[in-house]
């Protein structure tokens, strides 16, 4: 009998490398349990201007890197009809950036976010998770909501004026880490919906402690009062719709004990919220918010008018703010009953209108295609579970039609993608496509490059935020601090504003044209993309400081045309007494 030795030869059996499921889940856990809760003092804003977004993207880059490495190692692409359909949608959403009226530099952020979300979706599809591991993704979201709820309770009851978080204890609308009540409200409502959904899906194990699902009973008690305190109509509507859609599912598939337990928790949450609100000094806020008056009553029709005027090509990606202000100003000039546009509105507070106004028909078709594909996936799931799955999307989708959560909070976008994956895996079977050696190698290379580049960019973004905040809080201003800026890309407008407005103040104070002219040169460029009252106000002063009264009046008329509800007639530069300044300087030098 012959013995064949195969060790060290091509015949040797090669054990399959274990999938990187656990490291991937740990990285997603870090995103939800640590990275998204990071705070750093900032002047407000959206996107990467808020410190929790850079840390969230930084952590997510490692999740994507692990997924790409797994992708390259297994050498096969798992995909289905939804993968292809969403890819087509993303391509269609990207096409208008090639139009002649687009501003690629101003729209690059949303497109990078769009494709990053799609990449995360594809990465999730590559892992063969167990049912428990799939549910763990939903648990991460739920626990993250609970953490934010605890932080919000601390804001509401514990924080004092002048706190390190910059939380306004007078208005006292506990917005958590998000710095915006409606963003917090949709996040809370998502966690509320997930608590009922997960409670139904947990196996009933007798003679076991209830601690495994105790958090799911606590969620309504902790989140619903906060939704009331926040006085967010978006949150109220999302909460009511989600609970209403979930209750039939819980009643049908959960035990009666769990159904009544969760229902009582919802009732307890409403009772706590209403009773606390009634005895609070701010009890009138919720009643005020119940009034449906809102700027959306005229901004939505205005954006719709713009879409109707240019339905095919739109006004150009990245061009919403200047085109909106000019359009509404012209309409107001023709008809005084037409409401002037809102200053500094760079988004119509409706995702469909935003993509439609900027890009025209193709982006709208892309969004409808994606929506139909997801609804078909939901329809393919087990009867009786469809409304519950739809309920998970209600808070974020509803919010996206009333504001812009995806641009304010990265975690909302990531959560939305994970929910898409959850629906997809409930109803889909996958096909496989073998990858070439070159493709596998490239995927492994990208798995190393992406986290390095993203980490560098996000860390320098945080550092720049710190430097600019220190500069803006310094009294008197110390321009030397601005030399420490390491990455002005995200903060370019704010960075330039700090520099040139400081020059302008010095120039007006000392009557030095060499300091005034740089502000004029910069502001004439920025108002093309961001026509805002503050820029026009200072531009009038700058021209007056140079003695160019004709140009100052031209700018004043332009500003009054664009913002007819503001009074620019009182903007006037009063020169300082130069003799007094010289005398003061001489005394300081002696």
Q: Where do the PLM segments sit?
A:
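Alpha-helical transmembrane segments of multi-pass inner-membrane proteins
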Residues: 2-4, 13, 20-37, 56-68, ...
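Transmembrane alpha-helices of multi-pass inner-membrane enzymes
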Residues: 243, 385-440
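Transmembrane signal-anchor hairpin modules in multi-pass inner-membrane enzymes, especially those
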Residues: 1-95, 101-109, 116-123, 127-135, ...
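Membrane-interface micro-motifs in multi-pass membrane enzymes
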Residues: 47-59, 106-111, 175-190, 234-235, ...
């Amino acid at each position: 009998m012959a013995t064949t030795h195969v060790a060290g030869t091509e015949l040797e059996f090669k054990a399959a490398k274990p999938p990187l499921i656990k490291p991937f889940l740990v990285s997603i856990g870090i995103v939800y349990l640590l990275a998204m809760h990071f705070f750093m003092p900032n002047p407000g804003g959206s996107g990467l201007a808020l410190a929790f977004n850079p840390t969230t993207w930084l952590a997510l880059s490692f999740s994507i890197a692990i997924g790409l490495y797994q992708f390259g190692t297994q050498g096969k692409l798992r995909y289905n009809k939804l993968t292809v359909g969403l890819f087509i949608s993303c391509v269609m959403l990207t096409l208008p950036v090639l139009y002649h009226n687009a501003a690629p530099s101003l729209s690059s952020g949303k497109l990078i976010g769009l494709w990053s979300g799609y990449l995360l979706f594809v990465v999730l599809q590559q892992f063969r998770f167990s049912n428990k591991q799939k549910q763990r993704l939903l648990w991460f979201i739920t626990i993250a909501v609970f953490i934010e709820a605890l932080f919000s309770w601390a804001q509401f009851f514990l924080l004092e004026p002048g706190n390190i978080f910059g939380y306004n204890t007078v208005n006292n609308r506990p917005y958590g880490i998000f710095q915006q009540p409606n963003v917090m409200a949709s996040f809370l409502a998502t966690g509320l919906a997930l608590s009922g959904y997960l409670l139904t899906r947990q196996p009933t194990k007798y003679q076991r402690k209830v601690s495994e699902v105790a958090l799911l009973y606590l969620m309504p008690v902790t989140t619903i009062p906060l939704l009331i305190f926040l006085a967010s109509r978006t949150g109220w509507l999302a909460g009511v719709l989600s609970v209403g859609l979930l209750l039939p599912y819980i009643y049908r598939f959960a035990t009666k004990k769990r159904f009544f337990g969760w229902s009582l928790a919802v009732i307890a949450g409403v009772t706590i919220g209403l009773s606390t609100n009634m005895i609070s000094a701010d009890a009138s806020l919720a009643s005020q918010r119940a009034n449906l008056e809102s700027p959306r009553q005229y901004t939505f029709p205005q954006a719709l008018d713009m879409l109707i005027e240019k339905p095919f090509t739109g006004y150009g990606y990245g061009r919403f703010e200047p085109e909106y202000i000019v359009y509404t100003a012209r309409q107001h000039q023709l008809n005084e009953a037409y409401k002037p546009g809102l200053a500094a509105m760079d988004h119509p507070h409706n995702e469909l209108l935003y993509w439609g106004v900027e890009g025209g028909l193709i982006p709208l078709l892309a969004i409808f295609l994606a929506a139909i594909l997801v609804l078909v996936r939901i329809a393919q799931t087990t009867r009786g579970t469809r409304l519950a799955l739809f309920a998970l999307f209600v808070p974020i989708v509803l919010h996206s039609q009333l504001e812009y959560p995806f641009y304010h909070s990265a975690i909302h976008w990531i959560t939305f993608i994970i929910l898409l994956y959850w629906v997809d895996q409930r109803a889909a079977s996958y096909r496989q496509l073998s990858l070439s050696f070159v493709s596998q190698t490239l995927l492994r290379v990208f798995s190393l490059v992406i986290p390095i580049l993203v980490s560098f960019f996000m860390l320098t973004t945080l550092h720049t935020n710190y430097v600019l905040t220190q500069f803006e809080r310094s009294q008197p201003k110390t321009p030397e601090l601005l030399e420490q800026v390491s990455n002005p890309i995200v903060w370019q407008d704010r960075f330039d504003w700090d520099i040139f407005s400081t020059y302008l103040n010095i120039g007006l104070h000392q009557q030095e044209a060499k300091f005034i002219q740089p502000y004029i040169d910069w502001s004439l460029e920025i108002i093309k993309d961001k026509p805002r009252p503050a820029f026009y106000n200072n531009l009038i002063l700058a021209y007056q400081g140079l003695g160019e009264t004709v140009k100052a009046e031209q700018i004043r008329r332009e500003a009054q045309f664009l913002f007819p509800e503001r009074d620019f007639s009182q903007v006037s530069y009063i020169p300082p007494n130069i003799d007094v300044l010289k005398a003061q300087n001489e005394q300081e030098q002696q």
